Amino acid sequence: SIRNLIKCVQGAGIQMDALVLEPLASGEAVLTDIEREMGVVLVDIGGGTTDVAIFIEGSIWHTMVLPTGGEQLTNDIAVGLRTPFNTAEELKIKYGHAMPATIGPDDLLKVNVFGEDGQQHVSRQFLAEIIEARAEEILELILKEIKRSGYDGLLPAGMVLCGGTAELAGMRDLARNILGLPARIGQPQNLRGLVDTLQSPAFATSVGLLQWGIKHDLPHSAPQPE
């Protein structure tokens, strides 16, 4: 698959100067030097996968890719509420929460659903229960992977969450409860200009790749004419 990716990029007339492991790029953007040195687990919850990377003594010591991510959350919502996928994604982003216990049962949402009725009222708490179930599964897989790696108990800096799913309300608290580690949301650091636009955990990898290129003084490349 890497060969296919390289061919694709070269086919667009772009010279590839280096390949960078995704957790290394994300870590470049969101981790502090102290976290890397002390011991931290970086969790990047993407659309279809979740990348887990353990940093100790300033270096990456263990990586793992889990075959689940934010799209599974959206799919669970679509199935549970019998609503189209795009509606489920919108509900997740606008009203989603990973801690249903913090939401009142009377908080209702009007949802487009399949069938003759077209719409129905759904409690936001029920939406959160659907999200919590899948989020717990992802976090428990991460905990299992940390224990399997042998670095359990060696991560005093805790966990840093990034990726679009990290922006989900309650995700940090749920992660802290399940893993028993300090947790924070990783936002890209050392930015100038359009900070409000890029300072989101969803842009961790993109910003990190740019910072990696600057740090390692990679040559600039531009599209080549056909």
Tell me the role of every PLM-derived stretch.
Residues 155, 188-189:
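Extended, low-charge hydrophobic alpha-helical regions
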Residues 9, 44, 77, 142, ...:
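Residue-level signature of catalytic and energy-coupling elements of molecular machines
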Residues 97-99, 154-178:
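Glycine-rich phosphate-binding loops at beta-strand->alpha-helix junctions
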Residues 1-42, 59, 70, 81-128, ...:
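Nucleotide/phosphate-binding catalytic cleft detector across ATP-hydrolyzing
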